[in-house]
Regions:
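Extracellular cell-wall/glycan-interacting regions and their flexible linkers
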Residues: 1, 250-255
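Aromatic-lined substrate-binding rim segments of carbohydrate-active enzymes
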Residues: 1-54, 69-74, 113-120, 194, ...
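Short secondary-structure boundary/hinge segments and terminal tails
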Residues: 19, 53-55, 186, 226-227
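Short acidic-hydrophobic catalytic motif
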Residues: 58
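Extracellular glycoside hydrolase catalytic/binding regions
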Residues: 63-69, 73-90, 94-252
Length: 255
């Protein structure tokens, strides 16, 4: 990623894997953060829940007994204490909230932000949005924003009204896109909602992000996860991967 010109990676932490590995923090996160820091790059630690943190509902929720909100608080207490003096770490508190009202999500987000700050961590916190991290309308509930906090958005080709959803907020709030991408016609995908092209989706969306100075993380630097940037290993890029490399190369040249 960094050789391609990027300056940040997003590391998803699966709650079930974390639950069953007492050394997860040291075995994985510490090593990634150290490696990135040695090259002056950032790591976004993404707590990878997708669903309702209050009642645990959602088709993609992990098979563990803990209440998601309580377990999220436990994770962030431990993680914030561990990395509070590590400046290249960014905390993304919850991947994709689903099935809850704006006010309910605001209460959940406020509680997790408080846990992180109470642990002494002052780094940037990224807060997602309801409806699979797409509906920024909940920001109307905010009032005064927390210090050093940004708000994330996930956009794929099926979200055809993304500009309408973003336009009312990009000039008023610090927005960062922590997932976006598409699967071109050179790859087969299980999720047809990811199908898109450079011209119809990629150029339009990336140009909008550049115009409004919005940071982004492309998904996924992998050949298994969809939409993948690589084909059957890490040697040959998909059309999507080539487009990301072009975007990052352009940024590198401009700097």
């Amino acid at each position: 990623v960094f050789d391609m010109g990027g300056n940040a990676i997003r590391v998803p932490v699966d709650p079930a894997e974390y639950k069953h590995d007492d050394y997860y923090m040291w075995r994985y996160l510490d090593r990634v953060v150290t490696w990135a820091g040695e090259h002056d790059n950032y790591v976004i630690i993404d707590w990878d829940y997708t669903g309702n943190p209050i009642d645990g509902s959602g088709d993609e929720m992990p098979d563990i007994d803990d209440n998601p909100l309580d377990y999220s608080a436990e994770f962030w207490k431990n993680t914030a204490e561990y990395f509070k003096n590590t400046p290249n770490v960014i905390f993304e508190i919850y991947n994709e909230p689903v099935g809850m009202s704006d006010s309910e999500w605001k209460r959940c987000a406020d509680s997790l932000i408080s846990v992180i700050r109470s642990a002494g961590a002052k780094q940037l916190i990224i807060v997602g949005s309801p409806d699979y991290c797409y509906d920024l309308g909940w920001l109307d509930e905010l009032g005064e924003t927390n210090s050093n906090t940004a708000f994330s958005l996930h956009v794929y080709p099926d979200k055809v009204f993304w500009q309408k959803f973003m336009s009312g907020y990009v000039t008023s709030y610090p927005i960062v896109v922590t997932e976006w991408g598409y699967a071109d016609d050179d790859v087969e995908v299980k999720n047809e909602k990811l199908k898109g092209t450079r011209n119809v989706f990629g150029i339009k969306f990336s140009s909008y992000l550049e115009k409004h100075d919005i940071g982004w993380i492309a998904s996924s630097y992998d050949y298994k996860s969809e939409p993948a940037m690589f084909k059957n290993g890490y040697k040959n890029k998909t059309k999507w991967g080539e487009f990301v490399a072009d975007l990052l190369g352009e940024k590198e040249e401009e700097q």
